[in-house]
């Protein structure tokens, strides 16, 4: 690939050479962004902005933030990719020889570089939200959150249950208003829970890969393989408890027939319940 790019640059005209650096960065992004493993690491900020089809004056206002992201994310992606290529053999060797400490050092560095890519993306989104007209900020922020962190911001079954409940026929006005009030309260609590889950994701997601390597080493040596305590698990559990509580509150407002029309509104089984524990 490098040889091809060198040959290509050699035949470009002076005018074409001026266009080469941004094109080269785009080629790097297209190749390396999809390889991200962390939430938020694969977000194509420029592509996301392009999808919104903003007016020219809006795009001009966003141009400084997009240029900064273009340069910074390309540098971060190259640093991440170079480290992975240079240390792939070291990582494989550490797994064969059970040299866990060396392997963990490599994974920690990979995690830090991946977090840098994510930070560049998150920062760009924050800057764009500040630069957008007020009537466009909420929509863009919501789309970026769902695209970057679907594990956190995608609609839940409880969200869908409330939306479907509001569409039920023959709801008396008092019940309709009560459902709307509960939905507002739930949205506030879920927003707080999502913030805590986002913080836990930033703290603990790259650690999960290290924990997996530790469990692999423990299994190979005949030791126990218990899952390490993870802040993401605790934050997800707290969010599920909120969802389940509001699902019960919704059930209390509806008749049995209405509950059946909404699919039963049963709480989601825990991992232990699915295993029969």
Regions found by a protein language model. Give the residues of each.
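Charge-rich (acidic/polar
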Residues: 1-277
């Amino acid at each position: 690939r490098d040889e091809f790019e060198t040959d290509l640059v050699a035949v470009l005209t002076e005018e074409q050479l001026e266009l080469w650096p941004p094109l080269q960065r785009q080629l790097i992004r297209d190749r390396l962004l999809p390889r991200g493993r962390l939430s938020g690491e694969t977000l194509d900020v420029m592509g996301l902005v392009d999808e919104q089809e903003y007016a020219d004056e809006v795009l001009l206002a966003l141009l400084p933030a997009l240029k900064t992201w273009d340069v910074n994310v390309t540098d971060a992606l190259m640093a991440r990719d170079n480290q992975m290529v240079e240390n792939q053999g070291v990582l494989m060797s550490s797994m064969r020889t059970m040299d866990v400490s060396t392997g963990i050092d490599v994974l920690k560095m990979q995690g830090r570089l991946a977090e840098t890519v994510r930070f560049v993306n998150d920062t760009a989104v924050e800057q764009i939200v500040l630069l957008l007209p007020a009537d466009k900020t909420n929509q863009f922020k919501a789309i970026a959150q769902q695209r970057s962190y679907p594990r956190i911001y995608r609609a839940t079954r409880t969200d869908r249950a409330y939306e479907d409940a509001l569409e039920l026929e023959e709801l008396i006005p008092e019940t309709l208003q009560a459902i709307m009030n509960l939905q507002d309260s739930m949205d506030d609590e879920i927003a707080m829970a999502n913030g805590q889950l986002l913080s836990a994701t930033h703290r603990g997601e790259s650690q999960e890969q290290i924990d997996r390597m530790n469990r692999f080493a423990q299994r190979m040596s005949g030791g126990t393989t218990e899952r390490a305590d993870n802040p993401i698990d605790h934050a997800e559990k707290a969010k599920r408890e909120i969802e389940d509580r509001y699902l019960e509150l919704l059930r209390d407002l509806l008749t049995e027939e209405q509950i059946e029309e909404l699919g039963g509104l049963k709480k989601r089984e825990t991992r232990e319940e699915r295993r029969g524990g």
